Swiss-Prot record:
Molecular function, one GO term: peptide binding
Signal peptide coordinates: 1-20
Listed transmembrane segments: none
Source organism: Shigella dysenteriae serotype 1 (strain Sd197)
UniProt protein name: Chaperone SurA
SUPFAM superfamilies documented for this protein: FKBP-like, Triger factor/SurA peptide-binding domain-like
Name of encoding gene: surA
Reactions it catalyzes: [protein]-peptidylproline (omega=180) = [protein]-peptidylproline (omega=0)
GO biological processes: Gram-negative-bacterium-type cell outer membrane assembly; protein folding; protein stabilization
PpiC domain location: 171-272, 282-382
Function in brief: Chaperone involved in the correct folding and assembly of outer membrane proteins. Recognizes specific patterns of aromatic residues and the orientation of their side chains, which are found more frequently in integral outer membrane proteins. May act in both early periplasmic and late outer membrane-associated steps of protein maturation.
UniProt-listed Enzyme Commission number(s): 5.2.1.8
Principal location listed in the UniProt entry: periplasm
Length: 428
């Protein structure tokens, strides 16, 4: 399931969602700054949303409401794409191919199977590629612009890490859906009251059994409205603070809200909860090595043979590993320490070096090993299990703060871009 950090921002790169191919005769649906949204764009996304809803057996609102949601989505996309063009943001064919391959993999399909599925659904593959490229540009522009506005202080990381550490062994994750009833910038009291009344009415409908996904499609101003407001799984600490507080005692099936923020009133549905172990232990290795690099005066084969001779001298007692490293090793970072690499996790090393190291027993020396750096003799001195919970908690705290602030700042940023853009809707 997709992560809510991505879904909250509306990056809907799913294998069965794409715009239909443009029609020969087209009209302008909206003017956005110096660009346009075409009727074919609106009709194409309408087709995709209806197709997805049918496959998911999800009810949709009436066409007028759905069209309004789609128009707002396309207007926002156009605004951000124009920013990307000015910034020179480009997605290479290689990046695009990799993204599409990942989408196919996430949907348990080969690339050919996905192309066949798109064709079966009446969706043009080249048009699909273009839409994924657009979504990637939108994502990059949004991420770059929003992250520039975020500051995370060391004290914040320490405080949240301590909170995480004081929790139970299993930290809670939630699967949420979200509805946003928006407020304009500097709203009047009447506008606030009207939005709050609408939000409370939606909460009442949801608590009385109305389909939350249909309510989201009909009323939500969030970018994921067309996905039924689905945010997916994530930790409670990754949410904006006002959400986390409101969800601290929530149970599966709860409808939470309305919650007031700077951009409007939020309604959340807790689809599910689950726990996750926080104990983190890693194995570190203490190793040393002797490195010989092939050069114009030493061929690759000569370097290997030289290391074999050094290994034989160490085994016979003619020299020690440390002495040989100081005399022969061409690794400037470890030669003077007798080749000692200190304590580290094995995954930081070159793959060939790592694989050879993990096959050694304590006190054992390898045969010559070839890596991207040259030829090595490796000796495993010791291993240990290290509790990395504290470091992991700080790393997690930083990511949680980034995700939380990103969600809050992204909503404000998008509202600002929409308010400052010239938009004229020409059709209804």
């Amino acid at each position: 399931m997709k992560n809510w950090k991505t879904l909250l921002l509306g990056i809907a790169m799913i294998a069965n969602t794409s715009f239909a191919a443009p029609q020969v005769v087209d009209k302008v649906a909206a003017v956005v700054n110096n660009g346009v949204v075409l009727e074919s764009d609106v009709d194409g996304l309408m087709q995709s949303v209806k197709l997805n809803a049918a496959q998911a057996r999800q009810q949709l609102p009436d066409d007028a409401t759905l069209r309004h949601q789609i128009m707002e989505r396309l207007i926002m996309d156009q605004i951000i794409l124009q920013m990307g063009q000015k910034m020179g943001v480009k997605i290479s064919d290689e990046q695009l191919d990799q993204a599409i391959a990942n989408i196919a993999k996430q949907n348990n399909m080969t690339l050919n199977q996905m192309r066949s599925r798109l064709a079966y659904d009446g969706l043009n593959y080249n048009t699909y590629r273009n839409q994924i490229r657009k979504e990637m540009i939108i994502s990059e522009v949004r991420n770059n612009e929003v992250r520039r506005r975020i500051t995370i202080l060391p004290q914040e990381v320490e405080s949240l890490a301590q909170q995480v550490g004081n929790q139970n062994d299993a930290s809670t994750e939630l699967n949420l859906s979200h509805i946003l009833i928006p407020l304009p910038e500097n709203p009047t009291s009447d506008q606030v009251n009207e939005a709050e009344s609408q939000a409370r009415a939606i909460v009442d409908q949801a608590r009385n059994g109305a389909d939350f996904g249909k309510l989201a499609i009909a009323h939500s101003a969030d970018q994921q409205a067309l996905n039924g407001g689905q945010m997916g799984w994530g930790r409670i600490q990754e949410l904006p603070g006002i959400f986390a507080q409101a969800l601290s005692t929530a149970k599966k099936g709860d409808i939470v809200g309305p919650i007031r923020s700077g951009v409007g009133f939020h309604i959340l549905k807790v689809n599910d909860l689950r726990g996750e172990s926080k104990n983190i232990s890693v194995t570190e290795v203490h190793a040393r090595h002797i490195l010989l690099k092939p050069s114009p005066i030493m061929t690759d084969e000569q370097a290997r043979v030289k290391l074999e001779q050094i290994a034989a001298d160490i085994k016979s007692g003619k020299t020690t590993f440390a002495a040989a490293a100081k005399e022969f090793s061409q690794d400037p970072g470890s030669a003077n320490q007798g080749g000692d690499l200190g304590w580290a996790t094995a995954d930081i090393f070159d793959p060939a070096f790592r694989d050879a190291l993990t096959r050694l027993n304590k006190g054992q020396m390898s045969a010559p090993v070839h890596s991207s750096f040259g030829w090595h003799l490796i000796e495993l001195l010791d291993t240990r299990n290290v509790d990395k919970t504290d470091a992991a908690q700080k790393d997690r705290a930083y990511r949680m703060l980034m995700n939380r602030k990103f969600s809050e700042e992204a909503a404000s940023w998008m509202q600002e871009q929409r308010a400052s853009a010239y938009v004229k809707i020409l059709s209804n």
